[in-house]
Amino acid sequence: MKNIVYFFLVLMLVSCSNKEVLLPQVDRTIVATVEDHSPIYMFFETKEKDTLVDLNRKNSISSTNWIFNIDKRLPLKLVIPEVIKMQAKKSGSMHNNAESQNYFSYSDSIHKKLAFVPFTKVVYKLEKPKTGVTIYFSKNRILVDSVEFNKEKLEEYIENLTIEDLYKCNFCFDKNDSYGNFVKNYVFATTLEVKRTQTDTYIF
């Protein structure tokens, strides 16, 4: 019973304002713990037929690691502009610590615990890449230059690339996808990029 209750709490975070955030679920952990952090919340809200982001950054301290707790139901096209603004706010602060990191939080569905994936150096671009190979994650599909791949085929493709060719790969995500699906795909993409330091990520 304790395990069931604990996992329920991991799936759903409750902020100081008693609002709920339904976290994405992913079957692996990238980072298990984050010390000295500030929470950033993005809540799911609706007004008539519109979906809205309710951003709460009241407890953010620029010198700390920032953990973005974002509701998985939100569309990516609403989330990323807010993330970009918060990245700029932190980097532009006179109190910013160059060693601090930014993380997305999610629930590890296998180990039933809270987990995190870093995105500190990622530069989000709300456009299509103009050059290079496009690896496009759209809901349950992966397209490499418009050719459909499954995850195993993409892993093999990435493993066989030289570092030079890997630099030419652009990781892209569907702006109309949910944030929950984005995090699943982003965590998977993170595991593929071990040889790569390119930080541009495209949302279109």
Give each language-model segment a name.
Residues K2-F7:
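Sec-dependent signal peptide recognition
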Residues M12-S15:
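C-terminal motif of bacterial Sec signal peptides marking the signal peptidase cleavage site
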